[in-house]
């Protein structure tokens, strides 16, 4: 079992695998540069970035919806979500507005917050670099610095993961906005970026699952026990 966001990402990832297969079908797998196939590499970089962005948005929304549904009381909420409720209350001028969060009324406030996050998607998270991802998860579910979870002992520290992600997202921006980029895009770039994002998806989903478990005492998806 996995989150709905992960299932959607895995389905989208098949398109990337197909582009890599097309590259190999046309150019082979022997060492050496392939000319005339760079359009496949550029397309893959753009798609990987889009799928990474969509995954982050989806898992953040899924985590918030889980908290709204399963948190036992407002006391269990992360401080960042408590601040969100307090901010919305301050924006209301009616003196009785505070009573709307009594009992389970806070769930409605957070549901409204979820809808607002959905509306902000296109205009805010169109560059899914590490800072923007950190901001998204802090605002959506109260996780401080999501990118701090992106590390693999003996292989990569979180600072390096952030740097690599940001470089590839910048590359995607150059491709999308200028068409041609100063540096050519190779198949190695594609496979390296794809592997990085798959690793980031696993770490990000795991962090959200652990976070909502602490808040609600209920996992985002059930643990699969070996038979």
Give the role of each language-model region.
Residues 1-21, 25, 138-227:
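Polyanionic, low-complexity intrinsically disordered segments
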Residues 47-48, 55, 60-155:
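Helix-loop junctions and short alpha-helical segments
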Residues 41, 69-92, 190-193, 197-201, ...:
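Short alpha-helical interface elements
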Residues 1-46, 58-65, 70-79, 83:
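Charged alpha-helical initiation segments
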Residues 42-43, 54, 173:
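Hydrophobic alpha-helical segments, especially transmembrane helices
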